[in-house]
Amino acid sequence: MASLPCIPSNFKPGSPPRGLPLACKAFGAGASLAAQERWLMPWRDGGLGFSLLLVLAGTRTAEVEGISAAGATSAARRFTAVADAELLLKGPDRPRLCSLPPLPAGISPALISYVAARWIGVDPLVAAVGLTLSPPFPHLRLEVPGMGPAACLSTGEAMGLSRVHALWQRGFCLGRGLRRPLVLAECVPGGTTTAQAVLTGLGLQVADLISGSARQAPMILKQELVDRGLSKAALGFNPPPQRVIAALGDPFQPVAVGLLLGAREAGQPVMLGGGSQMVAVLALALAAMEPSHRQDMVDGIVLGTTSWLAEEAKRSDGRPGALECLIDCVGEFFGVRLLGLATGLRFNNSQHRALQDYELGYVKEGVGAGALALLAQLQGASCEQLLEACDQAMNQLLGTSYS
């Protein structure tokens, strides 16, 4: 993978306090203090650096009316990934070729990712696969042009098996070539539904554990699509993970699974930035491994997410929320202990309604926002500093004209 040069940041080398930063939370069966400390060690030193890869991908599942809030209409969602990536790369104060699609509420999580990436001093690398629109900025192309998005998962034939295999191998080669830790981020409208589909295809019962970009996830609609896809795919018992992806998945998944397996073979730790889509990737990787090797692999992996997603559907009596239940469900299914970490960033005191909407359950996560905010905290940023920077970025965004 290409080396990622640093850009100017507010990070000052030093020795951050041990343990998680203020307001950050660990969750999952692997959330022991010893496991947290072991995992955090390679990420605390800002001088070591890490690779940040954002994968953009497309699926026709996103065009189903009501399935996603990553764009107010199905037409708008075709361009969400490219617009989000351009915001991450260029920032809110420079003209961009792709306007952010209108959302029912909130603002793109790419704004949070941009702020955190600037603080850390990391320059993202963007990869694209299966998009309707080719990104108008330098990016890593993972397959020949013209392949297009995956078909809707309800067809039971989302992609050809040969395409899945090729993307898996492409990701594996990239991961195996890593020489430093990897933060993997994604932007895949409709991706929480394909995540639910592949997890179900692997044999897990997760229908009530999958979130999404909408304030109220369309659980009935999601399950209807999954049921139709499973019926047509006829996967049977214990299907191979590549077959599951081909039937029900999206192009991001085979790339990400390959990357994960390759990175761990190279001995590099990986932070999966997101929620259920990253949990699905981890489950697919575990399904491809011998049981005796699974815990060794996940010992170097953590899920990094936002507080809004980590606390979603958390019971008033303190019982775990949906995401924690999901990673524990996957961990129990494959006999491993998984660790999740959530940033402490909140927007209750933001100056902007679009950011305050996150506190109401809109958007929640995406483009690696939670993982990058967490890493910014690990390298010295306070929640107040990140909030102020996000407010400033919103001010810039509202004053930006588009070319």
From Swiss-Prot:
Entries under CDD domains matching the protein: DMB-PRT_CobT
GO molecular function: nicotinate-nucleotide-dimethylbenzimidazole phosphoribosyltransferase activity
InterPro entries reported for this sequence: Nict_dMeBzImd_PRibTrfase, Nict_dMeBzImd_PRibTrfase_arc, Nict_dMeBzImd_PRibTrfase_sf
PANTHER family: PTHR38811, UPF0284 PROTEIN SLL1500 (PTHR38811:SF1)
Family classification: Belongs to the UPF0284 family.
HAMAP family: UPF0284 (MF_01086)
Name this protein carries in UniProt: UPF0284 protein PMT_1350
Species per Swiss-Prot/TrEMBL record: Prochlorococcus marinus (strain MIT 9313)
